Each structure stands twice: as C-alpha cells, then as structure tokens.
C-alpha cells in the first residue's frame, strides 16, 4: 500500500499562494474522493489554517485519509488510515511535519523537522524503537512542492512547456529525489461525479514515478492521476456514510506460458520478453536495467514496444568460500545495511536474542545466513498478517506473513547477527507440477564477502534464474522506485522464450522470439 500513500501526498502539494498574505486566522477545507481503476476506494479531507504566531506567518495543512483495497492472490482486504499535519513559515518554508498511519494492525509515526541545511526524520513502527535519519541539503537544489508552485506563479511560468527541476524530499524513501514539474495547457476533465473540472495541467515526475495533475487558479489539485492507476477528484463533500465501491483486487500474479520442469534452483538461464509502453523519460527510468540479475534489451515492432531479458542464475558456485563468522571485515559500501530501520528492527531485543540463538554454532557467514533463512522459512506461516506490510517484529509476533514479511524478518535477524542485508522487490517465476505463474515478490540479499540472493519464503540461499529485479526497498535507495506501480497500470505479462537447466542444453519454446543480448 505504499503506492497509494505516495500518491495521496500529492493532494496537498500545492496551497494557494494568496494564503501567505493573510494576517488573520483563516480556515479552508477541501475534500477528495480516491479511485483505483475507476472504483471508489477512499477519500481525503484536508484543512488549511492560516494564522500569525508570535508575529510570524504560519500555514498548517492537515490531511485525513482513508483507503480500502483488496489483494487478488488471497482476497485479503486492508484498511489504511493516515493523518498528516505539515507546518509552513513565510514564503512556504517547511518547518515540521507529523504523519500517523494505521495499516491494519500496524501503526507508524513519522516526525520531520526542517532546519537550515538539514532534514531530520524520526520514525517508529508499532512498539519498535524510533529510528532517526538525517538528510543533508548542502549543495542540493532543495525545494518544497509549495515553494515550486509559488516560484512558477510569481515568475509568470504557469504556461505550457515551462519546466522546473529541483531536489524534493521523499518521506517514504527518507531521501532527496529528483523532481521535475512540466506545465501543460489549460484543460478540462469530466469528473466521475459528472462535474466538469477546468484548470492547468501539470506533469510531476518525482523519484522515478509520474503523476498528472489538474490545478485550479490557486494551485490546488482538482484532479490527480498516478502511474499506479490511482486517481483523486475534488468534491464538495464526502458521502456519509462512506462506502467503498467493491474494493478492486490488485493483480499480484500473472499466468506463465510454460512450466519449467524440475527444481527451479537448477534454472541456469531464462529468456523472456513482454510488451510494455514507452513510459520512461523526463526522469522516469526504464522499467528494467541490465545488472547481476539479468541482461536487458528493448524492442520495437510497428506500434508495439517492450523489453526482453535474459535472466541469470544466482546460485553460489561450488567453490564459494564464505568469510568466517562473526564477520571481521565488511566493505564500506555494505556497512549502511547493518543499521536498523523502521521495517527491519535489528536492534529490537527480542529479535537480537533470537538471531544470536539461531547462529550461535555457525562457523562461517554462509552457515549463519543459511540458518537464519531456514528459521524464517519454518517460523512464519505462509499467509497474510494483519497489515499490508508488517515490520520484522510484527511478523515475528504474529508468526505469519507473505514474502514481504519473510524478507523483512530475515534482514532484521541478519543485521542483528552482524551480516549486512537488504530487502529487494521485483517479480519471480514460480512453477508447480501442472501450472506456473509470475508474481510480484520480495526477497533479500545478504553480504557474505559479496552480495548473495536469499529467498526466505522458499528457504533458498542462492537462487535460480527466475527473478526480475525492480529495486532495493531500503531508506535512501531510490533507484527503480515506481516500477511496480507502472507494471500494475499496464498489462505486464512476461512470456518465456527459452530456458536452460543445469547440465542440459537450451530448450527454446515453439514460435518463441529471439533477441540479441549484449
């Protein structure tokens, strides 16, 4: 549900510049209905309070959001409630922000303080200890969204083809991310309520994800659309009682065109392709990159476009030698993945004690990673927990979870044992006896002298060639952000062209396509 929350942030990204000129307290209220694939899934009620505090101008923006949605693979329905309050000083200078989020059984509180040259973030999930982050602004072209709108308006640049690029703060990524505003024409749009909305169209590309806006004369959103197929429209009021219109299912799996026989760890290579529109550019990265998981090429045939990938085995070589355990030396680039995060509470006393108990007899780092992977695989029941995405401690307490919880718990336990580890997301090929499918998936990587893939959901340290990499789901790691959302809004269905099992010749499917990989 991170997708939905990220989109709703854009509902308060612009506030009337005129409000900064007020001298007496004034309150404004705005309401929005939220949709996913044309089904009403929630709402947001926003208030803007303008006042003078100790002789200085203040604007406080408060948003109350509710969303309800359902997953396709298990039919689980989640309710998300979120409250955000942000305070601004003169010239839309951000001062502070507090966000409280309830996702099923999980509660998260995030506090942000803006100071000269620094953004400080403190976040705590459930009963976990608060985790602090500091983002340095030195040398950065940092700007808040409200400041960006005010700049465009004051300079007379709210007209077609005008662009403004800057570094924006992403509270979800705990990092500065590139942001570009591209101003379009004055446009009209028919709302789902039947009302005609008219305003200035603006395309916002932030952190690799694109969002389309329709703004009124004061810069307030009339309509919002994201690449995740989530949209919002301003309305006069929220219906009472509010009812969700048949919560839509998030399509989390796609049927595969072939069942590869045998043990999936023995897949040494797999070639696939899929149709996908050209949706990158202007700061949006390609959907796939060539990396240790796969080689990638883009293809075009007539009006059709897409990607082809040659997936590589991630199994450990037979002569792999892991460093002794506990680790005595860690690469500088891997050290940051030893720190606790709100999702992976490696400093939690209960998790730290369990980690120490699991690895107490391990002699090398591979043995330790294998023991932790095996523990997580056996400990967590393979079913959804009480929230869309649980923290490691919450998953441990509930003793259940899907792939996301397996990855988070493994990473937390590995870090507690002194092994750098990180969460990864993408898609994976899974096969049974008679059927196979591709599913959105989360797994881990652990540093054993080099990065090694770990999938605790299936108890594998080192995996076969069946993973498509999207991004690292860690604070500060923004590369690839938004890729899952882009797949959800398009008909993303990988087609297997060929594969090779260990010790066997390549098998190419009938009528398959062949691409030249570098």
Task: Describe these PLM feature segments.
Residues 125-139, 372:
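Acidic/charged, solvent-exposed loop-and-adjacent secondary-structure segments enriched in E/D, K/R, S/T
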Residues 15-19:
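Sec/Tat signal peptide C-region and signal peptidase I cleavage site
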Residues 365, 369, 403-407, 437-440, ...:
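Active-site-proximal structural scaffolding
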Residues 4-14:
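Bacterial N-terminal signal peptides
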Residues 372, 399-427, 444:
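Cysteine-centered nucleophilic/redox motifs
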Residues 145-148, 317, 322-401, 476, ...:
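Secondary-structure boundary elements
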Residues 20-118, 122, 135, 154-319, ...:
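Acidic, serine/threonine-rich low-complexity disordered tracts
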Residues 236-238, 243-244, 329, 419, ...:
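Active-site rim recognition segments
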């Amino acid at each position: 549900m991170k997708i939905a929350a990220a989109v709703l942030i854009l509902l308060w990204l612009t506030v009337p510049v005129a409000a900064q000129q007020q001298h007496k307290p004034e309150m404004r209220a705005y309401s929005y209905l939220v949709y996913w694939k044309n089904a009403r899934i929630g709402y947001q009620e926003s208030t803007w309070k303008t006042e003078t505090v100790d002789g200085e101008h203040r604007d406080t923006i408060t948003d109350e959001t509710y969303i309800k949605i359902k997953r396709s693979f298990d039919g689980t329905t989640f309710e998300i409630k979120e409250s955000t309050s942000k305070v601004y000083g003169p010239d839309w200078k951000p001062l502070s922000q507090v966000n409280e989020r309830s996702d099923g059984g999980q509660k998260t509180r995030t506090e942000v303080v803006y100071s000269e040259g620094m953004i400080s973030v403190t976040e705590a999930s459930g009963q976990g200890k608060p985790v602090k982050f500091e983002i340095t602004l030195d040398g950065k072209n940092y700007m808040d969204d409200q400041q960006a709108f005010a700049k465009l308006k004051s300079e007379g640049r709210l007209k077609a083809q005008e662009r403004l690029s800057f570094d924006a703060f992403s509270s979800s990524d705990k990092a500065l991310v590139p942001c570009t505003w591209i101003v379009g024409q004055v446009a009209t749009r028919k709302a789902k309520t039947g009302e005609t909305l008219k305003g200035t169209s603006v395309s916002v590309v932030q952190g690799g994800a694109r969002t389309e806006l329709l703004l009124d004369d004061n810069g307030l959103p009339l309509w919002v659309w994201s690449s995740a197929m989530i949209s919002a429209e301003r309305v006069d009021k929220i219906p009472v009682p509010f009812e969700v219109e048949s919560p839509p299912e998030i399509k989390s799996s796609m049927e595969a065109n072939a069942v590869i026989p045998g043990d999936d760890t023995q897949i040494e290579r797999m070639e696939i392709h899929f149709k996908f529109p050209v949706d990158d550019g202007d700061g949006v990265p390609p959907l796939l990159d060539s990396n240790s998981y796969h080689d990638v090429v883009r293809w075009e045939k007539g009006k059709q476009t897409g990607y082809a990938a040659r997936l590589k085995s991630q199994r450990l070589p037979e002569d792999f030698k892991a460093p002794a355990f506990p680790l005595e030396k860690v690469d500088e680039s891997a050290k940051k993945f030893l720190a606790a995060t709100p999702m992976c509470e490696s400093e939690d006393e209960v998790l730290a004690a369990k980690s120490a108990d699991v690895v107490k007899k391990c002699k090398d780092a591979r043995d330790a990673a294998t023991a932790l992977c095996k523990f997580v695989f056996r400990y967590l029941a393979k079913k959804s927990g009480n929230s869309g995405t649980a923290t490691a401690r919450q998953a441990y307490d509930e003793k259940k979870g899907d792939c996301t919880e397996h990855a988070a718990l493994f990473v937390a336990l590995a870090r507690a044992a002194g092994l750098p580890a990180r969460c990864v997301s993408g898609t994976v090929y899974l096969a049974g006896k008679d059927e196979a499918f591709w599913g959105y998936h989360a797994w881990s990587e652990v540093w054993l002298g080099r990065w090694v893939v770990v999938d605790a959901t299936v108890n594998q340290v080192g995996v076969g060639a069946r993973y498509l990499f999207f991004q690292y789901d860690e604070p500060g790691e923004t590369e690839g952000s938004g890729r899952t959302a882009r797949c959800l809004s398009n008909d993303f269905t990988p087609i297997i062209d060929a594969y090779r099992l260990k010790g066997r010749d390549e098998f190419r499917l009938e009528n398959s396509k062949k691409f030249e990989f570098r």
